Amino acid sequence: MDKLADLNYTLSVITLMNDTLHSIIQDPGMAYFPYIASVLTVLFALHKASIPTMKIALKTSKCSYKVIKYCMVTIINTLLKLAGYKEQVTTKDEIEQQMDRIVKEMRRQPRMIDKLTTREIEQVELLKRIHDKLVTRPVDVIDMSKEFNQKNIKTLDEWESGKNPYEPSEVTASM
């Protein structure tokens, strides 16, 4: 276990791989050598990182199948990212979780639309009432029937003997 986590051991293995590749490929004009070396280095680092992780996970976990599946999916996704792919490998559990999340969101959307629609209708009704109160209407004839001081006034035709009782009359006084 100490050998797996030892940085010097890892660097010596990488140097050994590079020396081996240099001895195999004698052509100094080889253009793809740095890419091949970097891919092999990454694969070796993944190998060295994943084996201790999987050993620890298998010892501590009760459900080893899920752990192995998760580790494999993670390694494959890492390799796909390194290769430049945007797609990822997912497990059935992840797909089911995403589908559940999407279904919950789809159920939530109509409720939100209903709430927003109700609020918008209420706002439109309120704006209509405010508009109706603010609109000035042209007045041709003033209706005085509702005025307080006009309730008991009689017209000239309604007065007894056709005489206005409020008109001053001539008063003569003795001296």
Swiss-Prot record:
SUPFAM superfamilies: Rotavirus nonstructural proteins (SSF58030). Residues 1-28 are lumenal. One of its GO terms (cellular component) is host caveola. InterPro entries: Rotavirus_NSP4. The N-glycosyl content is primarily Man(9)GlcNAc, with a small amount of Man(8)GlcNAc. The chain crosses the membrane at residues 29-51. Residues 52-175 are cytoplasmic. GO terms for molecular function: channel activity; metal ion binding; toxin activity. Keywords: Activation of host autophagy by virus, Calcium, Enterotoxin, Glycoprotein, Host endoplasmic reticulum, Host membrane, Host-virus interaction, Ion channel, Ion transport, Membrane, Metal-binding, Secreted, Signal-anchor, Toxin, Transmembrane, Transmembrane helix, Transport, Viral ion channel, Virulence. Disulfide bonds: none annotated. GO terms for biological process: monoatomic ion transmembrane transport; symbiont-mediated activation of host autophagy; viral process. Glycans are attached at residues 8, 18. It comes from the Viruses. The keyword Transport applies. Ca(2+) binds at residues 120, 123. Its main location: host cell. It is found in: Host rough endoplasmic reticulum membrane; Host membrane, Host caveola; Secreted. It is a single-pass type III membrane protein. Plays an essential role in the virus replication cycle by acting as a viroporin. Creates a pore in the host endoplasmic reticulum and as a consequence releases Ca(2+) in the cytoplasm of infected cell. In turn, high levels of cytoplasmic calcium trigger membrane trafficking and transport of viral ER-associated proteins to viroplasms, sites of viral genome replication and immature particle assembly. Homotetramer. Interacts with the immature particle in the viroplasm. Interacts with host CAV1, early and late in infection. Interacts with host integrin ITGA1/ITGB1 heterodimer. Interacts with host integrin ITGA2/ITGB1 heterodimer. Interaction with microtubules blocks trafficking to the Golgi apparatus. Belongs to the rotavirus NSP4 family. Binds 1 calcium ion per tetramer. This is Non-structural glycoprotein 4. It comes from Rotavirus A (strain RVA/Pig/Mexico/YM/1983/G11P9[7]). The lineage of its organism: Viruses, Riboviria, Orthornavirae, Duplornaviricota, Resentoviricetes.
